[in-house]
Each structure stands twice: as C-alpha cells, then as structure tokens.
Amino acid sequence: MSDQITIGVLALQGDYDAHRQTLSLLGVRSVLVRKPEELDDIDGLVIPGGESSTFLKFLDREGFLAKLRDFVSQKPAFGTCAGAILLAKEVRNPTQESLGILDIAIQRNAYGRQIDSSIMTGPTKLDGPPLEMVFIRAPRIERTGAGVEVLAEREQHPVLVRQGKILAATFHPELSSDTRVHELFVNMVREQEKPRVQVTR
C-alpha cells in the first residue's frame, strides 16, 4: 500500500544519489530538486552534504533561499553534514548565513579535513544496535536548544538531533547500510501528512 508521500532530495551538490538509493530501499518515492518551484510538489526534503558555503552560493544564485526558508518552516527537512549546517541557527568557524530553523550552534570542519575522516559506531536512542556513522570533514554540534532532542552522540557531542519536524546529522547515513536514520525521517514525513490525508478521505 502506498504511503502517498514524495520526498525531495536537493540536488545542487553532494551525494544526493545515495540518499535516493536509501529511500528507494525503503519503498519511498523520491525526486531530485534542482529548481525552487519543485519544492511545491514534495512532502519532505533531504539536504545532503557537500560544502555549505558553496551551497549558499547556489541557493542565492538560483533564487532558492527564500523559498527554502518557507519550506522548512512548514514541512519536514533532513540535513546531513553541510545540510545540518544550513539548518542550524548559529554557524561557527567561520560564521555564515543559514536557514536558522534548528536551534543548535554548529562548528564547521570540527574533526579535521577529509584525510581525517572516519567510520565509527556509537550509542543511539534509535531502536536496535549502536549506529554506524561515517564522518567526512564533519561539523560538530556545540550547543542544543531546549527543544532539541539528541538521538546519537560521538565523544559526548550530539551527532544526530531532532527538533519537531527538523532532523539533522553531522555524519553521512546515506553511506551506511544502516537505514534507521532515513526510516526515522520517512516516518516524520508520514506523521506530518496524516492530517492532510485524513481530511481528503
């Protein structure tokens, strides 16, 4: 039975295909989002990793930023690595513009450059075993607001957080065989869509 949801994956940079593959494994319809108007046709949005300052240049150039701000204020969004930076309320090292929707302070490239990237497992509040986490030039969450739930940690720093309909990971769950983080986001989108589905019956 179809869940009647469509999740968009922002396809301006980063490994957006890996996110689509994971969503496909979960039986969820996904589309690549490259134009602002394509946000109108989706129920949730994945913002993949990459370089956050480059992301901003693309968004400014394409007229995306205002439309994206409006989207994340109303519908579920999931940011990984650079995507988490874009969602954050405060960005450090250096400071930069962001969507400001997620009440965290995040430091860019906190764990070193790409050569220092790592794969590890860590404790998580998600059901099941410890979570495999792939870090690539990862940012570090240095502060979380009162409404932010920490779902996984690395060295006592949050690496997976949720605030309402917003989910963010400083690692790359799309590069792991563990699909639980994407499953969580899919369920968040389904929950958001329930009232709309019920009204149209």
Where are the language model's segments positioned?
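N-terminal beta1-alpha1 cap of cysteine-dependent amidohydrolase-like domains
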Residues: 1-61, 67-70, 179-183, 187-201
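Solvent-exposed alpha-helices and their adjacent loops that cap or buttress functional pockets
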Residues: 1-3, 37-40, 70, 78, ...
